[in-house]
């Protein structure tokens, strides 16, 4: 539904989505340690807001499709995230499951992490110029502690 931009259908499917195994632990640590976070998405803000609310994600900021131009792979959305986070690129880390996530992070001089669970771009992502590669959500903890 998201790829077809059928947002009403996408909204209705959110309750059918589940967090990946290990993600609840990661989110609890982010929440308990007050780690400042931002979602940078190519989806519209309404969709991202609904996902954040449904899963009660500990997210302080969102940069959605219409919030920065040009969109990923351009660094503009990542630079907007740094501005919202009041953070320098050298102090940030970015996790993404698409090549454009890695490209945008790298272009903004942000340490990039390729996330290989659930990606539909595995063969492309493996050849992207990421700083780190991880295969499960729990590995996020080794990079944010």
Model-derived features: where do they sit?
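Internal catalytic-core helix/loop-beta-alpha segment
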Residues: 38
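Metal-dependent phosphoesterase signature
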Residues: 1-27, 33-35
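Conserved phosphate-coupling serine/threonine residues in phosphotransfer and NTP-handling enzymes
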Residues: 41-43
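Asp-based, Mg2+/Mn2+-dependent phosphohydrolase catalytic module
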Residues: 28-31, 35, 45-145
């Amino acid at each position: 539904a998201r790829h077809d931009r059928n947002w009403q259908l996408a909204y209705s499917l959110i309750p059918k989505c589940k967090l990946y195994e290990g993600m609840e632990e990661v989110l609890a640590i982010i929440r308990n340690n007050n780690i400042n976070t931002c979602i940078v998405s190519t989806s519209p803000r309404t969709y991202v807001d609904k996902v954040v609310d449904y899963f009660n994600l500990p997210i302080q900021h969102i940069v959605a499709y219409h919030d920065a131009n040009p969109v990923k792979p351009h660094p503009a959305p990542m630079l907007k995230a740094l501005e919202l986070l009041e953070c320098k690129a050298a102090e940030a880390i970015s996790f993404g499951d698409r090549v454009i996530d890695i490209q945008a992070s790298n272009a903004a001089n942000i340490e990039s992490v390729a996330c290989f669970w659930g990606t539909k771009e595995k063969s492309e992502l493996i050849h992207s110029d990421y700083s780190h590669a991880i295969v499960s959500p729990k590995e996020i903890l080794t990079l944010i502690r």
